[in-house]
Amino acid sequence: MNKLQEQLIALGGVFQAAVLVDRIARTGQASEADIGCMLGSLLVRDPKDTLEVFGGDDLNLRDGYRALVGALERDPSSLQREPLRYALSMLGLERQLNKRGDLLDTIGNRLPQIQSQADHFGLVHENVIASSGALYQDTLSTLRQRIQVHGDMRFLQQASNASKIRALLLAGIRAARLWRQLGGHRWQLVFSRRKLLNELYDMMRTPS
């Protein structure tokens, strides 16, 4: 796996979280497997490669890859506008988070508690989702920039959906942090668009 592929996997994680946030906001639903993959990515320690963070299978990120391709192709028919907005907002929030050692410490201190809950209850148990959502609220929600989620108020006002959305945003920002640590930069999305697309097309064709 080359460096660009590693970056695209992490960026695919950002877009996967964005797609799931949009899906829950609009329909109130997202599969447990998809949510579990993203929550699990928060708890992975010392992965052998970037794909292992997301369960070791590109299929776990297929919706994120599609949304990323749509953004890079700039084709109005395939562009997913809200997921793109959420993804770019997560990249921006991660840059703010990187300057806040106190918030990074809080996240680092509380993730082991969430891991213990996941070990006891299971990864997609409501307690684990609620704790992950609360961690987002106590840290990233305190930053100046906020992510405004648009959707159906019937679903957005349900506490369980609000927790899922916050937990997914936390996972997306974790993926954004990983992307940046792997050498990812926002200017790549503008100036290296064709190169990223060609690599993504290959990744989506080739089984992991």
From Swiss-Prot:
Membrane topology field: Peripheral membrane protein
PANTHER family linked: HIGH FREQUENCY LYSOGENIZATION PROTEIN HFLD (PTHR38100:SF1)
UniProt family annotation: Belongs to the HflD family.
Intrachain disulfide bonds: none
Cell compartment(s), UniProt: Cytoplasm; Cell inner membrane
NCBIfam families: PRK00218.1-2 (NF001246), PRK00218.1-3 (NF001247)
Chief location category: cytoplasm
Pfam families xrefs: DUF489 (PF04356)
Keyword Cell membrane: yes
Lineage: Bacteria, Pseudomonadati, Pseudomonadota, Gammaproteobacteria, Pseudomonadales
InterPro entries: HflD, HflD-like_sf
Protein name: High frequency lysogenization protein HflD homolog
Species name: Pseudomonas putida (strain W619)
